[in-house]
Amino acid sequence: MKPAVLFVGHGSRDPEGTAEFLHIVELFRAHDPGRVVECGFLEFARPVIGEGVARCIERGARTVAVLPGMLMAAGHAKNDIPSEIHEARRRYPDVQFHYGRHLHLHPNIIELCRQRIEETERAAGPADRKDALLLVVGRGSSDPDANADVAKLARLLWEGMGFGWGAACYIGVTTPLLPEALERCHRMGYRRVVVFPFFLFTGVLEKRIRRQTEEFGRRHPGSEFLCAGYLNVHPLLFDAFAERAEEAVHGSPNMNCELCKYRVRLPGFEGAVGQPQVGHHHHVRGIGQDEGGHHHHDHGHGHQRAGGAAGHE
């Protein structure tokens, strides 16, 4: 039979975000009904990853391609998911596991970012982009490589779309944080600031970005502060996931480890090189969902190869 595909999501206390992730999984099931397609979450939702693996095995899979449903490679993709794969290999020694790569700055992702920004501009009315500033907001991580990718995306969109200025900030963990970035943007004097949340799906953090942007705009009526939509379910996103799934199924993800803090001595992160690969989400696996704040765990994680095709993500 075809190799099974196991989509791994972060999980959220916000049921809307979980539902959007599950929608993508259902689209893949409908697209390829002859393939076993399951999912698992790192935290705050069920099924957890181990349960998703078990479902694949129960349905007859002898090869499982594990696909991280994430934009950037930080602690979750580099440690937590490979740690789960280690456990799955121990539990199912006769099953082969492949590990795919995160979406990263796939051309479809960049194009979808552009479309979401343009949708917001059209809704707000015409304005010269030379008089506008683009602010890309990432999740924020203790991994500088992931944070740098957000800054790279901001530059690509800034130059490619012709904004007067562009910048990157984050909603947590690292700096600059969104409130500080909004203040800086305001001081620069641009007539319009377009805030783009670089998130796959909605959730506590995406809604926080929107709320903070709207509140800042109300306090500063002299400038226009717009919050664009996040990526969300879209044919471009589906096709990007499909490409990553094919790579994973064939055990041939093309990974770039040149700036991974677990392999290379980066300034300020020297102690991370060669740390053991250990998951950090055991205490929040599948604990349920509510509308409260999302207690996110983004510690410094160790990283070694998971072995075989499920190695460094």
Per-range role (PLM):
Residues 1-313:
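Active-site-proximal alpha-helix that buttresses catalytic centers in soluble enzyme cores
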